[in-house]
UniProtKB/Swiss-Prot annotation:
Family: Belongs to the WRB/GET1 family.
Protein location: Endoplasmic reticulum membrane
Protein's recorded name: Protein get1
Side of membrane Lumenal, spans: 1-4, 132-155
Organism taxonomic ancestry: Eukaryota, Fungi, Dikarya, Ascomycota, Pezizomycotina
GO terms for biological process, alphabetical: tail-anchored membrane protein insertion into ER membrane
Name of the coding gene: get1
Residue ranges that the UniProt entry lists as topological domain Cytoplasmic: 25-110, 173-197
Membrane-spanning parts: 5-24, 111-131, 156-172
Length: 197
């Protein structure tokens, strides 16, 4: 089984990724993936996409047809466009209501798997040391702070380890971002040298 040290560290990486990428982006990506699964909504989504293309094509044809010179053709296109548009809006409304309930479910699952799990771990393992410190290695006040609030003296508590992991993940991400920007900047900033004739 994975140790408490790594569980908390991986949890903080997941929380950082969700915060960095953005909850809305993750929700939209999961919604698109859900629509690709063979569910009842798959057919509705396919039909909505088809109707959207049809509405756009009919609108384009209407704009290309003169309403004064070719009124009969324009009126026929207008009726087809209005019918396709009303069908599209009905399907769009159905998908929007489904997306609302899907987003609600995803938000609950995301909260339970990140923040909820973090809170559960803090309460469940509040008296359990994450790891022991060597005896006499640190002065008493430092040991007391590291064991705060309920871990045994001479150990590191879950709450302190949570803070350490959150800070470490943030600092590591900033270092990686800085290095990536520096490498990208140095790759673009290579001056071209002119050859002498």
């Amino acid at each position: 089984m994975i140790s408490l040290i790594w569980t908390i560290f991986i949890l903080h990486i997941a929380i950082f990724l969700v915060n960095t990428i953005g909850a809305a982006t993750i929700d939209n990506l999961l919604w698109l993936l859900y629509l690709k699964l063979p569910t009842s909504l798959y057919q509705t989504a396919q039909e909505q996409t088809k109707l959207k293309r049809e509405v756009v094509q009919l609108k384009r044809d209407m704009n290309n047809t003169s309403s004064q010179d070719e009124f009969a053709k324009w009126a026929k296109l207008r009726r087809r466009h209005d019918k396709a548009l009303s069908e599209y809006e009905a399907l769009n409304q159905k998908l929007s209501s489904q997306k609302g309930s899907f987003d609600w479910f995803v938000k609950i699952a995301r909260w339970l798997s990140t923040t909820g799990l973090k809170i559960f771990i803090q309460f469940r393992y509040s008296k359990t040391p994450v790891f022991e410190l060597p005896g006499g290695w640190l002065p008493y006040p430092v040991e007391w702070v590291l064991a705060f609030p309920r871990a045994p003296q001479g150990s590191v508590s879950v709450q302190v380890w949570n803070s350490v992991c959150a800070t470490a993940v943030t600092v590591i991400a900033e270092i990686i971002t800085g290095l990536a920007l520096q490498v990208k900047g140095s790759a673009q900033a290579v001056p071209a040298t002119a050859k002498k004739a």
